[in-house]
């Protein structure tokens, strides 16, 4: 698909349509194409329906433009974390499957923290993390988090509140090739992206 604004830039796009399917006429009346994932390492998604009614999606977490085998490994690429998907107001909502919570340990929680300038939070470190942060207030224009930072490498998450744009920058994540590292997406308002959840894993970071 041809790129439009911030949409459809990864070259191997996975898209979805929301509409009505007429079984009798065998006709689907869909709306506009929507991005399923804004990253470059997301390909060939598939879904399955669990007995409890949840629809689960998983995809190949690899890019055709960044094919390489991590040192000491015998494999190339990996699968994404399974996601629970649902529809809300005509948009697909994606969340990590709840079963992952069984593996959580060493929880660290901070509340009502005022962040000004650079800030590191004690007890939050490592290469495998499940991170949730809630951004509140309206006296800031830009919020940045550096993930998996060490030895000169990091991945940067940015929320531009004034322009309603989120950005993931992997320029300094340690790629062996000069590939597309910055991905951006628009959000409708600051309120609709106040709760940010992400997972950092050493192998996922390498991809």
Stretches with model-predicted labels:
Residues 7-13, 76-77:
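Short, solvent-exposed loop/turn segments at conserved positions within beta-propeller repeat blades
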Residues 23-207:
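Beta-rich accessory regions
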Residues 15-19:
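Beta-propeller blade termini and top-face loops
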Residues 3-6, 64-65:
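Short glycine/acidic-enriched loop and turn motifs that connect beta-strands
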């Amino acid at each position: 698909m041809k790129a439009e604004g911030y949409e459809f830039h990864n070259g191997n796009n996975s898209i979805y349509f929301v509409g009505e399917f007429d079984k009798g006429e065998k006709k689907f009346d869909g709306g506009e194409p929507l991005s399923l994932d804004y990253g470059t390492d997301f390909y060939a998604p598939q879904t399955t329906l669990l007995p409890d009614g949840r629809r689960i999606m998983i995809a190949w977490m690899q890019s055709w433009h960044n094919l390489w085998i991590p040192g000491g490994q015998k494999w190339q690429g990996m699968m994404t974390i399974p996601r629970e998907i649902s529809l809300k107001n005509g948009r697909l909502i994606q969340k990590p499957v709840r079963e992952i919570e069984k593996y959580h340990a060493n929880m660290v929680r901070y509340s009502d923290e005022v962040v000004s300038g650079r800030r590191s939070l004690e007890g939050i470190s490592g290469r495998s993390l499940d991170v949730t942060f809630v951004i509140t207030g309206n006296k800031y224009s830009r919020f940045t988090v550096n993930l998996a930072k060490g030895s000169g490498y990091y991945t940067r998450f940015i929320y531009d509140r004034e322009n309603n744009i989120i950005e993931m920058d992997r320029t300094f994540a340690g790629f062996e090739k000069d590939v597309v590292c910055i991905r951006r997406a628009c959000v409708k308002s600051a309120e609709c992206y106040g709760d940010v959840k992400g997972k950092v894993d050493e192998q996922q970071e390498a991809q």
